[in-house]
Amino acid sequence: MIEFIDDDLGYLAWTVVHPDGYVLNVRRSPDPRYVILHRANCKSISNEAHAPGAYTGRSYRKICLSSEAMLQAAAKREGRSDGTPSKRCGHCLPLIRS
């Protein structure tokens, strides 16, 4: 598990190396209502055409997971007591085993 804050270049490089990984898009300050799960290759969170800081700057962080096994711990760390994301991306439709 790796977290990116104010490092879009590092984050985008991680998504290229781990296209089958998972990304939790979260607010800068933990908010259990905003823990969005994406696949690492989701174009809504890995398009290099966005302005610098669009992904890991401003109000957001990215928590990157190379395997599904890490997901529950990461979600709990963000305040999700059941260890699940608050939402799954409607574009990449990440599937996880229950």
Regions found by a protein language model. Give the residues of each.
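Mature, structured domains enriched in cysteine- and short glycine motifs
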Residues: 1-98
